[in-house]
Amino acid sequence: ENLMKTMKELFEILLEHGESENDCMIVTVTKSSGSAPRGAGSRMIVLADGTSHGTIGGGSIEYEATKQALLGIQEQTSFLKDFVLRPNDAADLGMVCGGQITAYFQYVSHENTVFIDQCRSLLANWDQAKQLWLLLDLTEESN
């Protein structure tokens, strides 16, 4: 039930910011290995002002993911990014837990009325919904 509450809050935030004409980024852990702080499916929303909701692990990984999300919002693009959580690697984030995660950064434009309408409909019927799927388009497009 806690996960469902969190998912409902995610859609409420997406709807609120879409209706107020603010773009945002959904950051979802798609793969984790080793001793990563959060597993696949963990997500957070990053708003254009740098505010975030939810978590993908906290600390330096979330700090770096927020920086990447803000760049993606500026460039209006979605992308995959690997984060290494052990010392002395190219993408070292200085976290001692050791491991690696891959995160998908899904850009959500306030102009995407289909997505905003889906959020509105989903929330209006939340209590009747038995099974919900949040689909991510993982296609990497070149800019």
Give the predicted meaning of each segment:
Residues 2-143:
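Segments forming oxygen-rich coordination pockets for charged ligands
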